Amino acid sequence: MALSQKALLVLVLSMLLTASDSWARRINCKVFVYAPICRGVAAKRGGDSLSVGGSAELDDTLTDPFLKSEEPKEWRELTRLSRVLQTFLSHPTGEMEQHD
């Protein structure tokens, strides 16, 4: 191989490597939203609705009712009524103990 052919080969290979590297970075993140290079782009462009704080608040809103230790008011009332009914049924004479 002549020197000019080697130089031409090196030039072409370096251009191909440069082009392939820049081509790999040019991904349309609107189409490939889950591509590793596109992670976080929607949050950066989206504004407040997609911010991390907004997301955490939304998660809290969705999970709080399930994580609260306090029973809903209806369940407390049903539990109280079932206790009164059990007490009534356990005393056939009709005498009932006072419940709150």
Swiss-Prot record:
Major location (coarse): secreted
Oxidoreductase as UniProt keyword: no
GO molecular function annotations of the record: toxin activity
Location of the protein in the cell: Secreted
Pro-peptide positions on chain: 44-100
Cellular component GO terms, alphabetical: extracellular region
Leader sequence segment: 1-24
Disulfide bonds: C29-C38
UniProt keyword terms in alphabetical order: Cleavage on pair of basic residues, Disulfide bond, Neurotoxin, Secreted, Signal, Toxin
Expression across tissues: Expressed by the venom duct.
Entry remark concerning the domains of this protein: The cysteine framework is C-C.
Family: Belongs to the elevenin family.
Task of the protein: May mimic the function of prey elevenin neuropeptide. In vivo, intracranial injection in mice induces hyperactivity.
Note: Negative results: has no effect on six different human nAChR subtypes including alpha-1-beta-1-epsilon-delta-epsilon/CHRNA1-CHRNB1-CHRND-CHRNE, alpha-3-beta-2/CHRNA3-CHRNB2, alpha-3-beta-4/CHRNA3-CHRNB4, alpha-4-beta-2/CHRNA4-CHRNB2, alpha-7/CHRNA7 and alpha-9-alpha-10/CHRNA9-CHRNA10, when tested at 1 uM.
Subunit structure comment from the entry: Monomer.
Annotated protein name in UniProt: Elevenin
